[in-house]
Amino acid sequence: NPFGLGGTVTSGIISARNRNIGLSRYEDFIQTDASINTGNSGGPLFNMNGDVIGINTAILGQQGSIGIGFAIPSNSAKQVIDQLIEFGETKRGWLGVRIQNVSKEIAEIEKLGKARGALVASVAPGSPSDKGGIKDGDIILEFDGKKINEMQELPLIVAQTKVGKVVKLKVWRNKKEITKSITLGRLE
């Protein structure tokens, strides 16, 4: 640590999961009130059983340990570590769509019942979604068995899925649910 004090332990509680703080589009932080100081990012976040559940990453606050801390979940870190060991780089899945939120008004017009999923604003030509038959205006409701409640969930789930995997997308089109199979590409 920057102060030369080794073996320091702090305590706190997990106050939220699945936090996005605007650092990148692939965020899924654990929020904690444990004291995280300048320079100690990368330290482990433990649960009460002594298991590592995250890697301390960021703090929101003006000065040192005063604020809210964020940690990358250990399962997300493990995926990156495994890819770095195997390939020397990370490989993220890619659908090739630009998406936006499904508003209450859009849900009503589309007879969706409630606002959920990710509205496809555009499909990149030649992308996996283009090849798989996804169209502008489709609403992606489910990705490979995982329900998409809010638009921002989709990019993270896609990025964490293996490149080349064939996934099933449940899509709302013309006021009915259809299923499409897509072979994920690689995000460059």
Give the predicted meaning of each segment:
Residues 1-116, 121-126, 132, 151-166, ...:
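Serine-dependent protease modules
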Residues 137:
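Conserved catalytic motifs of ABC-family nucleotide-binding domains
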Residues 143-148, 174:
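Short strand-turn-strand beta-turns centered on an Asx-Gly dipeptide
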